[in-house]
């Protein structure tokens, strides 16, 4: 990914937005699992969130666009984690400006997605986004919480 160029930055942001749409689809899966599960369930519990993980991880890895893929999801108590990988870029090639744009772009998209709000954020489940380069080396990680979405 040519993230040192403006077109690369734009492609990365388009990929991020597409990734948010994948996250929204996962939110619908969370709602389905929540409705079909037992009557009283702590939806923030690691046990419940890991049931969601087990249901959706067979869908991955999945290309978000030519530059980005979602590799898997994971969970811990009160936190649902999305793992993304930039498939064509090494950590040394990443423009710091692109990384700086990640959090606000993903936050806006997540907070605007009703499925994400209703199935995660309003249930006080933190969303964690973890990004790595083509070799799996860490690039960025951040959380989105109720406070970020103002709910």
What residue spans do the PLM features occupy?
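Solvent-exposed, acidic/flexible segments
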Residues: 42-45, 49, 82, 92-100, ...
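Polar/charged, Gly/Pro-rich intrinsically disordered segments
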Residues: 67-71, 76-81, 85-93, 117-151
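Hydrophobic membrane-insertion alpha-helices, especially the h-region
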Residues: 11-31
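N-proximal, solvent-exposed amphipathic alpha-helical segments enriched in charged/polar residues
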Residues: 34-77
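N-terminal Lys/Arg-rich, disordered targeting/topogenic segments
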Residues: 1-8
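Solvent-exposed amphipathic alpha-helical surface segments
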Residues: 33, 59, 63, 109, ...
């Amino acid at each position: 990914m040519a993230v040192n160029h403006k077109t690369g930055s734009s492609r990365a942001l388009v990929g991020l937005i597409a990734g948010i749409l994948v996250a929204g689809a996962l939110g619908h899966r969370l709602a389905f699992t929540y409705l079909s599960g037992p009557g009283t369930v702590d939806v923030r519990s690691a046990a419940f969130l890991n049931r969601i993980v087990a249901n959706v991880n067979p869908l991955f890895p999945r290309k978000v666009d030519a530059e980005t893929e979602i590799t898997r999801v994971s969970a811990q108590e009160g936190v649902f984690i999305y793992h993304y990988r930039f498939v064509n870029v090494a950590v040394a090639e990443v423009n710091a400006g692109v990384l700086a744009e990640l959090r606000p772009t993903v936050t806006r998209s997540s907070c605007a997605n009703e499925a994400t709000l209703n199935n995660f954020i309003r249930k006080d489940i933190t969303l964690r986004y973890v990004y790595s380069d083509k070799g799996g080396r860490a690039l960025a990680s951040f959380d989105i919480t109720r406070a970020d979405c103002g709910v």
